[in-house]
């Protein structure tokens, strides 16, 4: 079994179902079974312990259920205590290693991010965060050994991770907005529209925004549908959500990718806040509490953004090589060297904050944006004012 061909940087990716001409299935049940057992071997070596707890979740892809069954079987055959979280976001799966209600040793997310419906993949987490490229190579080596001995004491329990994760986000909003009149409903009077792209992000409407008093009318594509019938599940596909914000006269729009590790925003005028603008907005939020911090971005950011960061926000801007893990790892490295870096972000919408485990979490970024929008709303201002001095290039072309 050639598992190496399934590695895509720090992820596993492959064709999971037939349906696209010329694309045969590569991410088989046998492959994910072996990868699951390889992950167990990786964790046992790292933590030097036999008894492990591992959480598993998935996005809305049509192949998720079948793959999950094979992965769970691999974990159970290794004697693992499995926590089946069902529909989840990629960042919430890491948080299953953090939350007191879970305290997992590791987590597996079944997702292929924004790729077409016939693709799927796996992301792996331990208590330190997402596994990197070299970790995946080690995991694959373990998985290819195929000399596994089945154990008898594995088990499976089902738990609602998204509800715990949503409560975490709600408490953050209540605390940071600190509404003087309606503390428990800090988003009262605000109209916030969400486009979940038929991925896993619909929970943000009914589990986060609505309980806090937000009017979410006009929100679209909230139902999980792994065929992605409305638009590609990518926060860079902005036209539909921009139109919806204008039509519904919303104060703010939020769009997620399939597994909610990326997000972008729309201001009240229907203007997209994506690519260079989402970097600028995230930096503006961070620099209020951390003046002069270093913002690490991918290399394709514009000169206009660089000027905004350094000469308007007065933070340091470091362009680094592309790839969200590269950008995050560089920010982590800077902090270890004593250089404060609070934000690592790609123009694609991958944003990781130091205050949040350097986890690239689209819902956490959206939450920070919602908090600031709510505070500005109380003061009679709007979010677009934060980046009004950002100039845009006359033409953007990626080579």
Per-segment meaning from a language model:
Residues 290-399:
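Phosphate-binding and adjacent anionic-ligand microenvironments
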Residues 82-91, 272-275, 297, 319-322:
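Active-site nucleophile and cofactor-binding loops and adjacent substrate-binding regions
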Residues 41, 53-119, 170, 207-266:
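N-terminal small/polar loop signature for handling phosphorylated ligands or for N-terminal nucleophile
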Residues 118-245:
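Gly/Ser/Thr-enriched, mixed-charge loops and adjacent short helices
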Residues 1-71, 77-78, 154-189:
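An N-terminal, well-structured beta->alpha segment
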Residues 105-117, 245-267, 272, 318-319, ...:
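Glycine-rich phosphate-binding loop
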Residues 49-59, 83, 191-193, 293-299, ...:
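Short glycine-rich phosphate-binding loop at a beta-alpha junction
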